[in-house]
Amino acid sequence: MIKRLRGLLVMLCCVAGMAVAEEKNILVTSGSDRATPIAVVPFGLQGGSVLPEDIADIIGNDLRNSGYYSPIPRQNMISQPSQASEVIFRDWKALGAQYVMVGSIVPSGGRLQVQYALFNVATEQQVLTGSVAGSTDQLRDMAHYIADQSFEKLTGIKGAFSTRMLYVTAERFSTNNTRYTLQRSDYDGARAVTLLQSREPILSPRFAPDGKRIAYVSFEQKRPRIFVQNIDTGRREQVTNFEGLNGAPAWSPDGSRLAFVLSKDGNPDIYVMNVASRQISRVTAGPGINTEPFWGKDGNTLYFTSDRGGKPQIYKQSVSGGGAERVTFVGNYNANPKLSADEKTLVMIHRQQGFTNFKVAAQDLQRGSVKILSETSLDESPTVAPNGTMLIYATRQQGRGVLMLVSLNGRVRLPLPTAQGEVREPSWSPYLN
């Protein structure tokens, strides 16, 4: 069984004897230029207390994860100023830093006041200054906020470090005793909280565009059904109860509709439901498996995986009618489509002709070229940050399911800290502020 047709092919075997896809475009396997050196100096703390989180470390990691910046190691810092007036620019020029951030933390009345300033080292000019306040429990929130502000000021791209992630863990205690847990965490895997536990599989969690609701597939009734749950209240509703497969939910950009896969009429096909009225309409038809829908920003186009041509490839089709158009031509396997924020890049699970490994790849939709982003194999379930700079995917390392973060420019690849057990099915939230 090929597992990459996530959600659907967990339950169905792939069709055998598939024809080889035609190679039409270019494959790029490596290469990227150097990230911009930046120094995020440890923030000064008044009062001599010890905080549970290192705010400067979190900011530096955020900027690194974007693939745009390379933080200078603390042990290399010649000086460690905490105020703008203490910055000696020759120290940072000697280290090759293009930017330096300093900051201070002042406890006051049970809260923390965090001040920060960012400088261009070459011009010796301040490019950003600000302050943010919160409790000790909000240190990570404040750090992500400062990283968001800094990233947007330097790049013009809205930061996505204050976003969240969904994922599923599976802990097997014995042959017939596995616990599945739906978790929500910071985008970097920190501060995980449990949203749902079940003795039956949970698949395909997806944030609604408002960030307040999620959709997912649950087997708690011994068959797949789609649920919608309010994150804050925990209230949940079953929204599908059709015979056969109910899988791969995907929210429309305005949150009013869900696309998903049903097999009630025979082959697995894509349908769209009005969430308020529960009315459904069929989008795809014909032979083969059609699955893994993903909405375009226009709210009318669906990208999806289909094996109608022999092997899994990605197609797009209007929900209002018309035929499907094939999108991918490089490789003999392309599945699980996701679009970048500007819709210029298609992220997918890709297998090259003549290889057996499944990789995360990005296709330039204008030129058709494909770039391999991951260095792992058996990759699945890519999910893209709302600003299109990073992605998270599931893979296997040392016999265990794990999550990996990759920058879309290919400069950063790192594992994310998660709970014990098999970790899978990541889904990135929209902007939450």
From Swiss-Prot:
A cellular component term (GO) from this record?
Answer: periplasmic space
Q: Does the keyword Hydrolase apply?
A: no
Look up the signal peptide feature and give its range.
1-21
In which compartments does the protein localize? Periplasm
The answer to keyword Cell division applying to this record is yes
Q: Kindly state which keywords UniProt assigns to this record, in alphabetical order.
A: Cell cycle, Cell division, Periplasm, Signal
Pfam families, sorted? PD40 (PF07676), TolB_N (PF04052)
Q: Which GO terms describe its biological process?
A: cell division; protein import
What quaternary arrangement does the UniProt entry report? Answer: The Tol-Pal system is composed of five core proteins: the inner membrane proteins TolA, TolQ and TolR, the periplasmic protein TolB and the outer membrane protein Pal. They form a network linking the inner and outer membranes and the peptidoglycan layer.
Family named by the database record: Belongs to the TolB family.
What's this protein's function?
Answer: Part of the Tol-Pal system, which plays a role in outer membrane invagination during cell division and is important for maintaining outer membrane integrity.
Q: Which NCBIfam families match?
A: propeller_TolB
Q: What is this protein called?
A: Tol-Pal system protein TolB
